[in-house]
Structures are given as structure tokens and as C-alpha cells.
């Protein structure tokens, strides 16, 4: 079914879209104090259920995401603020709001680990050159340790995605360099009582070959698999994930990584594509997708093949298609995790999600 959207509704939807902000410089040339791991306070009333959910906290929606984390603290074991970006071997910049002590302290008080994410958006070949140079890797580890020591962080999460498309001639060397970086960084962090996470792309028959899952699973405390963007903003419309895709991802991952170290990434967002347009899809949070669906009076539909929701509508003379994930779709995906013995998840991202997701996650994978 296709429905029309009014200009007023368009304005309403666009107001809820996240808008990334410019970076602020972070300099960590010296370490003032390397803090030990923060202890999670004991809770009374008997042993609580295990916390199996982690989540990323987006800097461009920081306050809402922080309040969302506090509201679901009993389910969250780790929050990773999406705060930092690697620019070179020796330079790591902070996004707006990076390192806000109020948030770090508040999460710790709620018994949640704070493990910031360091991402990168380097041009092709730049990160590969860093990873394949032992000297530059050593410089980069020093910069990352400086960052960890700048606040009461519990460790670090590396989200280095630009190497995913490394070509045939160099992907083995680049993958080995990334593994060496993670191995040496984790060793240094463990000596300080800190944790070390690696965020990676899914490994399938056609993707993810640069990631040495087996070696990463030996040295990292957790390996986070970004199990979303099966269809992406600049591609053709379709589901962000599917149960069959999850099966392929986990069949390969659990053959190489201890299941207790795997965190399966869950999407809490969607894409809104314009039919016949080369323009990339609009990003929507899961909550925003539902607001849009109701605004255009589109019926709710769960795709039986992928077990993800979708709808179409018209904006002006253009047909638009939205695919996203919600609590109902996630509930259909979790049995795949259970079949492989994977019980830990990581959500992209806080305050994006369908509010009903938390009760689904509470029942566990």
C-alpha cells in the first residue's frame, strides 16, 4: 500500500533526523593518570539476572541516549559512547561532548561499564599503511592509551571499518596488521586492568575476509559483529538484516570466536529510499520510522522472508520505501542467536530503539 505524506508531516519527520556535528580536537600527548578498572557495585535483593546487553551512545543525540541508558541500567553491562575518531597514528580527535565526566560518572553509578568507541573514516589505504607498519602501530597504541588514561574509562572499543574493502593483493597483510594492533593494545590494556573490544563487519561468503576472527577472538575481550546494513543507504531498498543472514554470520563466527566473547550487533534504525533516485537513503531511527509510518497512515507489515518491518508511501510524486527494525523483528531474530549459544548483544544505538525492544531483550537470546 502506498500513502501520501503532507508537507507538514515531512517537516515533522525531518526534525527528528540526527545531524552529525563537527569534530573537536582531543590531545592526549601525556597520561596524567591511568585509572584501574571501575568495580560494578553489588546490588541487594539476591543475584540479579545477568546483563547481556551493550549499546553505543551517539554523540549527536547524547543526552537522550544517556537518559535511555540510565532507564535500562539493569539490562546494560556496557555503554560505548561514540566519542572519538582516529585521524592518524598519533592523533585521535573527540566529537562534541566527548569525555563528559557527568555521563561517565552517571553510568558508573548505575553499574555500567564505560568503554568509549574510537572510529575512523580514513581514505582508502591510509589505515592500511598504519596497520602494516610496526612503528606506526606502536605510536597509535600510545595515543590510544593516552585517551583511555584521560578519563575513568574501563577500556576501549576499536571500530576501524575502512579496511573492510581491502583488495586481493593486500587484505591478508592488512588483516594481520589489524590483529597485531588489537593484540598489542589488548595486552597493554589488560596490564592496566582494562578491557579491549574489537568491532568488526560480518564474515560471510562474500564479505569480511580482512578480519582474522580466530586470532581476534583469542586476544580481545569481546568481538562485536555489526550485523546490520544488509541493505544500505547507497544501495537498493531491502531489509537491514534477515534471519538467514544471521544464521550465516553466526555459523562462521562461532566456528572461530568463543561464543561468550561474541556481541551480536542489533539495528535500531532504518533507511528511507526514494524510488528511481541516485540519492542515498535517509536515515531514520526505529522510533522515527514508526512516527513516519503513522504520519503517512501506512499499514504495519513484517516481511516474512527477513522478519523485518517495512512500508511504502508517497512524498510529492515520489514513491519512497522504508525498511527498519523494531521489537517484533528483533524477537524473530533472537532464536538464531540462541541456536548458536550467543547470548550477548550490542545495540546501535541508544535512544534510537522501539521502546518495546527492552522487554524482548530481557527475555534473552
Where are these regions (language model features)?
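Terminal targeting segments of Actinobacterial cell-envelope proteins
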Residues: 1-20
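Secretory targeting and sorting signals
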Residues: 16-46
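Glycan-recognition patch characteristic of GH18 chitinases/ENGases
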Residues: 45-144
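A cross-domain feature marking catalytic cores of carbohydrate-active enzymes
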Residues: 57-59, 83, 116-120, 160-162, ...
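Conserved, mostly hydrophobic/aromatic
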Residues: 79, 158, 223, 264, ...
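Substrate-binding surface in catalytic domains of secreted glycosidases
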Residues: 89-98, 142, 164-296
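Glycan-binding loop/region signatures in secreted carbohydrate-active enzymes
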Residues: 266-333, 365
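Acidic/aromatic/glycine-rich contiguous surface patches that form carbohydrate-binding/processing clefts
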Residues: 333-365
Amino acid at each position: 500500500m502506498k500513502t501520501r505524506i503532507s508537507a507538514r508531516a515531512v517537516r515533522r519527520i525531518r526534525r527528528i533526523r540526527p545531524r552529525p556535528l563537527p569534530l573537536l580536537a582531543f590531545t592526549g600527548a601525556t597520561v596524567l593518570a591511568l585509572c584501574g578498572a571501575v568495580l560494578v557495585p553489588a546490588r541487594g535483593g539476591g543475584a540479579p539476572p545477568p546483563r547481556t546487553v551493550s549499546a553505543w551512545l551517539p554523540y549527536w543525540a547524547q543526552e537522550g541516549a544517556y537518559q535511555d541508558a540510565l532507564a535500562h541500567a539493569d539490562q546494560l553491562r556496557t555503554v560505548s559512547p561514540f566519542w572519538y575518531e582516529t585521524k592518524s597514528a598519533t592523533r585521535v580527535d573527540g566529537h562534541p561532548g566527548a569525555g563528559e565526566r557527568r555521563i561517565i560518572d552517571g553510568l558508573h553509578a548505575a553499574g555500567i561499564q564505560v568503554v568509549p568507541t574510537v572510529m575512523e573514516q580514513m581514505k582508502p589505504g591510509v589505515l592500511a599503511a598504519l596497520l602494516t607498519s610496526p612503528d606506526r602501530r606502536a605510536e597509535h597504541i600510545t595515543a590510544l592509551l593516552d585517551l583511555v588514561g584521560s578519563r575513568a574509562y574501563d577500556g576501549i572499543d576499536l571500530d576501524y571499518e575502512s579496511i573492510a574493502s581491502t583488495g586481493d593483493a593486500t587484505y591478508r597483510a592488512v588483516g594481520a596488521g589489524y590483529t597485531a594492533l588489537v593484540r598489542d593494545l589488548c595486552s597493554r590494556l589488560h596490564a592496566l586492568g582494562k578491557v579491549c573490544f574489537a568491532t568488526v563487519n560480518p564474515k560471510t561468503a562474500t564479505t569480511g575476509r580482512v578480519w582474522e576472527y580466530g586470532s581476534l577472538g583469542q586476544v580481545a575481550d569481546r568481538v562485536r559483529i555489526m550485523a546490520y546494513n544488509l541493505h544500505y543507504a547507497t544501495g537498493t531498498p531491502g531489509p537491514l538484516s534477515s534471519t538467514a543472514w544471521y544464521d550465516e554470520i553466526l555459523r562462521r563466527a562461532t566456528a572461530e570466536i568463543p561464543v561468550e566473547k561474541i556481541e551480536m550487533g542489533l539495528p535500531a534504525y532504518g533507511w528511507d529510499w526514494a524510488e528511481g533516485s541516485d540519492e542515498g537513503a535517509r536515515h531514520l531511527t526505529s522510533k522515527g520510522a514508526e512516527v513516519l509510518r503513522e504520519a503517512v497512515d501506512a499499514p504495519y507489515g513484517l516481511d516474512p522472508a527477513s522478519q523485518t518491518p517495512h512500508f511504502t508511501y508517497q512524498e510529492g510524486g515520489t514513491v519512497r520505501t522504508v525498511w527498519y527494525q523494531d521489537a517484533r523483528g528483533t524477537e524473530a531474530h533472537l532464536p538464531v542467536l540462541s541456536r548458536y549459544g550467543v547470548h550477548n548483544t550490542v545495540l546501535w544505538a541508544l535512544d534510537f530503539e522501539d521502546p518495546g525492544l527492552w522487554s524482548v531483550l530481557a527475555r534473552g537470546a
